[in-house]
From Swiss-Prot:
Source organism per UniProt: Mycobacterium bovis (strain ATCC BAA-935 / AF2122/97)
Entry's Gene Ontology molecular function annotations: imidazoleglycerol-phosphate synthase activity; lyase activity
Free-text function comment from the UniProt entry: IGPS catalyzes the conversion of PRFAR and glutamine to IGP, AICAR and glutamate. The HisF subunit catalyzes the cyclization activity that produces IGP and AICAR from PRFAR using the ammonia provided by the HisH subunit.
Origin: domain of life: Bacteria
SUPFAM superfamilies: Ribulose-phoshate binding barrel
UniProt main location, coarse: cytoplasm
Keyword Transcription: no
Name of the protein described by the UniProt record: Imidazole glycerol phosphate synthase subunit HisF
Gene3D superfamilies assigned: Aldolase class I
Length: 267
């Protein structure tokens, strides 16, 4: 049992369970396997299903936006906000303060920033100042520094373009810098664990948890209900998954039940 630990969900704030929808040109990718849906690739319809199943929040990531220069899908956000009333975070292709403004006006509650913040350090501070820290999420795609590359202090580096490009920036230091600049939470995605279904990167979570005081969302690696409580024990305030939910390998309810069985508070 984890309940006696000083960790999220142990008698404190409830740990959030967040499905992530990767969206390409307005369609959910990575596949979905819901029965009784008219269109299993429609993000709005999927969002409504997850809302009904008890998801605490939703995250939309435009997986093509940063690498191909597409603007984020405002119309999808508008349609979702009209039907779904849990918090919605949107990321992908967010480059300017104006982009954040457009997404918030369309109905997003929070906006995740990744590549653009690396290119312009002032951007996070400007966004937090204008819209409030609670609206700004720093998305960190971290991987173990490849053999032959210059090492970083923590052993992890920040990547961009869906993990395809290394930056040489230390991932833990970058998360801490983002918190200092005013972001309200860190979306920490392990590119090493992503897609493996072997569990979250607990060492990475512990390292970032020790470096920041803002909430941390664990992402990358979820494959079984047993994987979620250790992520919380390692410091996650929220747990995010995509394909295990989309393919019905796990449900929101099963994950919450597994967390509750370990003494972790859920909604």
């Amino acid at each position: 049992m984890y309940a006696d630990r000083d960790l999220p969900g142990a008698g404190g704030l409830a740990v959030r369970v967040i499905p992530c929808l990767d969206v390409d040109d307005g369609r959910v990718v990575k596949g979905v396997n819901f029965e009784n849906l008219r269109d299993a690739g429609d993000p709005v319809e999927l969002a409504a299903v997850y809302d009904a199943e008890g998801a605490d929040e939703l995250t939309f990531l435009d997986v093509t936006a940063s690498s191909s220069g597409r603007a984020t899908m405002l119309e999808v956000v508008r349609r979702t906000a009209e039907q779904v009333f849990i918090p919605l975070t949107v990321g992908g292709g967010v480059r300017t303060v104006a982009d954040v403004d457009s997404l918030l006006r369309a109905g997003a509650d929070k906006v995740a920033v990744n590549t653009a913040a690396i290119a312009c350090l002032d951007l996070l501070a400007d966004m937090a100042r204008q819209f409030g820290s609670q609206c700004i999420v720093l998305s960190v795609d971290a991987r173990t520094v490849p053999v032959g590359s210059a090492p970083t202090p923590s052993g992890w580096e920040v990547t961009t373009h869906g993990g395809r490009r290394g930056t040489g920036m230390d991932a833990v230091q970058w998360a801490a810098r983002g918190a200092d600049l005013g972001v309200g939470e860190i979306l920490l995605n392990s590119m090493d664990a992503d897609g493996t279904k072997a569990g979250f990167d607990l060492a990475l979570l512990r390292a970032v948890r020790a470096a920041v005081t803002v909430p941390v969302i664990a992402s990358g690696g979820a494959g079984a209900v047993e994987h979620f409580a250790p992520a919380v024990a390692a410091g996650a305030d929220a747990v995010l998954a995509a394909s295990v939910f989309h393919f019905r390998e796990l449900t929101i309810g099963q994950v919450k039940a597994a967390l509750a069985a370990e003494g972790i508070t859920v909604r």
